[in-house]
C-alpha cells in the first residue's frame, strides 16, 4: 500500500487520504485497496477472476474465490478470498494434542493476536472478519469468525478425506492437484489445513504435490493463509 507523506521543515509527516484531498492531491490507490472497494460494492466479479494474483511486499496472493465467504458483520457474501502462495512460513498447529479443534490451537491464537507477523501490515486494514467452519477429531462441526485462517480439507477437495466430516465448500480455484500447490523456501511445500483428522493429535494437510495427507500437530509445516477483503 502506498502511504501519504508531506515533508515539513525537513520532517516527514504522514497524512490521511482526506488531508491529501484537502491539499488538492489525489491519493494513490493500492491494488488491495481497490480490490476491497470493488468487493464491498459487489463489483469484484466484474473486475477480477479466480486465479488472478496480486503482489504485496514481494509476497504473492491468489484470488481463490469471489462471493464464496460471508462477511460476519453484514451477513453478505460480497467478498474476495485470497490465499498466500509463496514465501510460506512454517508452524506447528499445537505443541500437543488439540481435541477441541483448530480454534483452540496455538497457530490460530497466533493468527488472531499477531496478524502482522503473518501478512504484510499494509493488507491488514482491508481484511474482513468472515464465518468459517472447522471439524474436530470426533466429527463435531463448529463455527468461528476470523480474519486470518488456514483452509479446510473440504474447501480444498469438496469432501472429507482424512477429516471425520466436511467443514466448508470447495473453492472454485482448487480444481486440481496443481491448483493447491504453494511454495516455501525450497520449492513446493506441505501445508496445514484447519480440519482435524480422526485423532486428537493429528490435523489434515496438503502434501508438496497437492494431495491430501495428515500429520501430528507437533510437527512444523507450511501455513498457507487465507483471508477476505
Tell where the protein language model's regions lie, with residue ranges:
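Collagenous Gly-X-Y triple-helix signature in extracellular proteins
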Residues: 2, 17-229
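Short, intrinsically disordered N-terminal pre-domain segments
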Residues: 1-17
